[in-house]
Amino acid sequence: AGQPLIVHQMTALRAAGITELVINTGHLGVQLTSVLGDGGIWGLRIVYSPEPPDALETGGGIFQALPLLGSEPFLVVNGDVWTDYPFVRLPAAPVGLAHLVLVDNPSHHPVGDFSLRNGRVEETGAARLTFSGISVLRPELFANCAPGRFPLGPLLRRAMTDGQVTGEHYRGGWRDIGTPQRLAELDGELRRRHKEQRSNSPSIGD
């Protein structure tokens, strides 16, 4: 509450020792660059990967940004999620092509996305969880892709078929705030928490 979601994410990433960010920008590109700049005031180095007005979806956006990301595995955090996940827990180099953070299914997505069994993420299975939008990916995941608009999901599913996707189940705070209503609900909840914390804090003279 009180700060843009992306600033919350940036602060959490900085706390985990991550200092170099690539931000995909679409229709909000001008606003983002004017507010965030080069990231220096947060102790970060930000470079931007501008997307066309019709956007490229997650897969196409990452593929376009690959020259900025280098040849090593990289962390991806969707811009429309809030979480208190400790990013320092993530593997620097996944065993396979991808490592996904999965969470309990929210009410608006009760069927989930994938299953987790013995540390491997699978498309099939009875107990399904929701992909949080947090992942560590290897550039090789995009080896056969071409520039343009495409989703990330099919690439992950293909890698799952080959046993190349690991994962973990995070049970802490996570919210998909992809709609104005869900964003307003989260903001209200965080404001209530902040107010409760202040009222429970000892005052001088206690």
Model-derived features: positions:
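Short, flexible loop segments at the rims of nucleotide/cofactor-binding pockets, characterized by
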Residues: 1, 51-55, 145-146
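Short conserved AdoMet
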Residues: 1, 18, 37, 69-70, ...
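N-terminal glycine-rich phosphate-binding loop and ensuing alpha1 helix
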Residues: 1-32
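Well-ordered alpha-helical segments embedded in enzymatic catalytic cores
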Residues: 5-8, 61-64, 155
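Catalytic-core segments of class I nucleotidyltransferases/pyrophosphorylases
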Residues: 18, 75, 82, 88-93, ...
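Conserved beta-loop-beta/alpha segment of the NTase-like Rossmann-fold superfamily
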Residues: 33-34, 38-112, 116-118
